[in-house]
Amino acid sequence: MILLAPTGRSAKVLSGYCEKEAFTIHKEIFYTKNNYSGNLDFSLKVNKHKDTLFIVDEASMIGTNRSEGVGLFSQSLLDNVIKYVYSGFKCKLLIVGDSAQLPPIKSNLSYSLNDEYLSKEYDKNIYSVELDQVVRQDVNSGILSYATSIREKIELKEFHDIKFKLNGFSDLIRVEAVSYTHLTLPTSYAV
């Protein structure tokens, strides 16, 4: 089993929970080398693993945008992950993520967690499970209460009139907004 995550921080958190070393996606699947212009060149490694399950956490952060470039850079990070994993002998991929988290940069949706997209784009049989029991938050948590409320409103596409009452939750505090339009800066400084 190989544990992967998009960022160093998410790999470290994953390692802590699983008590097994996790790597960034880039470290596992790409070779890097300096080219003569001082930039880094990336090339896809050969997957030498056999009968290995690759678990990619925080997959909502994995981009699917392709570019007009050539070779490796005309493909998305998800393209490269799938190409790398399935090039190994009998290797499998488990994608883990939260569909309610922010999508990748320059994307409106996290397609890496979208069954239809994955099935159509990569011609793979997709099996998915959605977990609905929270285990890392206190049942009486205000954060959990509002996160659940927001998730439900997103599913129902009810984006209007979202209001929060902070009373009764010890883990929430009201912070007054600051309007920067009323702040003025001095026009000169004394030396």
Which positions does each model-derived feature cover?
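Inter-Walker segment of RecA-like/P-loop motor cores
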Residues: 5-46
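Hydrophobic "anchor" residues on beta-strands that sit immediately upstream
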Residues: 20, 53-54, 92-94
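Short basic/glycine-enriched coil/helix segment immediately N-terminal to the Walker B
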Residues: 41-52, 88
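Walker B catalytic acidic pair
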Residues: 57-58
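Residues immediately C-terminal
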Residues: 61-64, 101-102
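Flexible beta-alpha connector loops of hexameric P-loop NTPases
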Residues: 66-73
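Conserved helicase motor core of P-loop NTPases
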Residues: 77-80, 84-91, 99-183, 188
